[in-house]
Amino acid sequence: MEYAIEMRRELHKIPEPGFKEFKTQAFILDQIRSYPEDRVSYDTFETGVFVRVKGLTGNRTIGYRADIDGLPIEEATGLPFCSEHPGFMHACGHDVHASIALGLLRRIVELPVMDDVVFLFQPAEEGPGGAEPMIKSPLFEKYRPSEMYGLHVAPEYPVGTIASRPGVLFASAREVHITIYGQSGHAAFPHLTIDTVVAQAALIMQLQTIVSRSINPMNCSVITIGKVDAGIRENVIAGRALLDGTMRALNGTDMEKLEQRVRDIIRGIEASFGVKIDLQFGNRYYEVVNDQRVVDKFSSFVKMNANYIECDAAMTGEDFGFMLKEIPGMMFWLGVNNATSGLHQPTLNPDEEAIPFVINLLDHYFREYV
């Protein structure tokens, strides 16, 4: 498995934002083109890649998805193969995800399994979302699998551990972008202005009442405002203010309620403070819902070969949910033993021993158990 670890290190050097993974796509294509054309076929979609490895019978098609984009985070790992792109890093482990797919693909090319195996190297998971356009592409019908699998690295679990659950594994997620317009002016004459900072502060506080007062307390939902911006200097009342945030919910009904309550509160803020507000919702990521039958089959296999944990649902957002709305399948957490640094942190450094572990596990599963 030295090959897969080498792939991870090369990919780690070239993190790229969503739909701009040009070097990453070229690197993946270089690997795929080295295989015999009678065994491996492929197509590109945007900066992603569809790949089919022919099986011995080809009676069914099993799908495996790996996301490939990086994050706008300055790396602080100090690794000898750290990011060569300033301000960008594989801080969510997508380099690991892609290298696992490349290693598994190589294994299956060398030692064919019975079924065809389709690999989806997907762009833009971190945004604006690559799964939905990828499965809506006409190419998807050419590669459509009967079952779909995917994983995500989990720093909190040790190497050798797989964690998942039937039903909802990850939450539905949607970005919120709000611009407040008022009237700027001198700080000494607030009565001649419309202060967007005061409206911004009130809006932030009111948004935080939605989950506690509009959502069933037995359900899990989150609204987080992660970015605010307003003003140009201390003695000028701001005529414009910005808020960016995210909403998460474990079911679609609650997500719709969150959206409606945001609209309601914004109308009230406009009336109360005399401002005008532009509200934009980003792409919605659907819940990742694991198929009961697939989870039962996979977890039974893992329990015989590794450590399996049935975990709780997480408020993490993942656009793999789009694929699982179309195809029965599952996603699971892969332990990578990095307890001191979590996802989206500049020091994330997954234990590379997890790479050969899960390649061997999935190869065995696809070969003998699926």
Curated annotation (Swiss-Prot):
Substrates-to-products reaction catalysed: N-acetyl-(2S,6S)-2,6-diaminopimelate + H2O = (2S,6S)-2,6-diaminopimelate + acetate
Enzyme class (EC, first level): hydrolase
EC number: 3.5.1.47
Record keyword DNA-binding present: no
Coiled coil: none
Active-site feature positions: D67, E126 (proton acceptor)
Pathways per UniProt: Amino-acid biosynthesis; L-lysine biosynthesis via DAP pathway; LL-2,6-diaminopimelate from (S)-tetrahydrodipicolinate (acetylase route): step 3/3
TM helices/strands, residue ranges: none
HAMAP family: DapEL
Similarity field: Belongs to the peptidase M20A family. N-acetyldiaminopimelate deacetylase subfamily.
Entry function: Catalyzes the conversion of N-acetyl-diaminopimelate to diaminopimelate and acetate.
PANTHER family cross-referenced by the UniProt entry: N-ACETYLDIAMINOPIMELATE DEACETYLASE, PEPTIDASE M20 FAMILY MEMBER
Name of the protein in its database record: N-acetyldiaminopimelate deacetylase
Taxonomic source organism: Exiguobacterium sibiricum (strain DSM 17290 / CCUG 55495 / CIP 109462 / JCM 13490 / 255-15)
